[in-house]
Swiss-Prot record:
Region (Disordered) residue spans: 238-257
Protein name as it appears in the record: tRNA (cytidine/uridine-2'-O-)-methyltransferase TrmJ
Pfam families: SpoU_methylase
Record-linked InterPro entries: Alpha/beta_knot_MTases (IPR029028), RNA_MeTrfase_TrmJ/LasT (IPR004384), SpoU_MeTrfase (IPR001537), tRNA_m1G_MTases_N (IPR029026)
Amino acid sequence: MLHNIRIVLVETSHTGNMGSTARAMKTMGLTNLYLVNPLVKPDSQAIALSAGASDVIGKATIVDTLDEALAGCSLVVGTSARSRTLPWPMLEPRECGVRSAREAEHAPVALVFGRERVGLTNDELQKCHYHVAIPANPEYSSLNLAMAVQILAYEVRVAYLDRQQANAPVEEEEEAPYPLVDDLERFYQHLEQVLSHSGFIRQAHPGQIMSKLRRLFTRARPEAQELNILRGMLTSIEKQDKYPQRGTGDTAGKSKD
């Protein structure tokens, strides 16, 4: 299960934080590190601060975009302070660990950490199913990157060990499969296209409508079959109203006999 947990760092600017993160991961049994458009590449300082976890640094996957790091994941949790400007489903660290451990038995799970100074952007946070806030001292809530990784990695390990001790059979607890983030993004693109052609939203300025719809579907979290039904509905609307069709390579959402 632990091999399915991805620790994703977005635009990290200090190699020392990469090394300290690798150390925090390895102490909890996590080894799958993704670096999204790092401002610096891992170097000798990263190796030194990894304190024996240089293998995690050496195997790190470096990608250009967050979408690449999230590809194939069924659950994405982004670290964020609570925000009134972008209300989103929130998790406490303990619940984050429990959900991550459970879903990682069936598909990859990504825990996403933002830039050292400014965190994740709103657009990046909207790619997450949940946000997690670490309840630090409000009078001094300054956690560095590796500390935040250590806390969430610990919660994942505790949940993993609890499941091991309970000897919970995967078959008995298997939930209906959720769509991967790639499928969700294609659904959102399809939805925006149909709403634009219908005149419900302005294609050049979708504004807050798509953000609110993303939040709605994030709360509902449709299963894979339910998402296929929604895609099929959109495809039916396109055909009925004779909208321009999408590329022939995109077959998602078509009904099956």
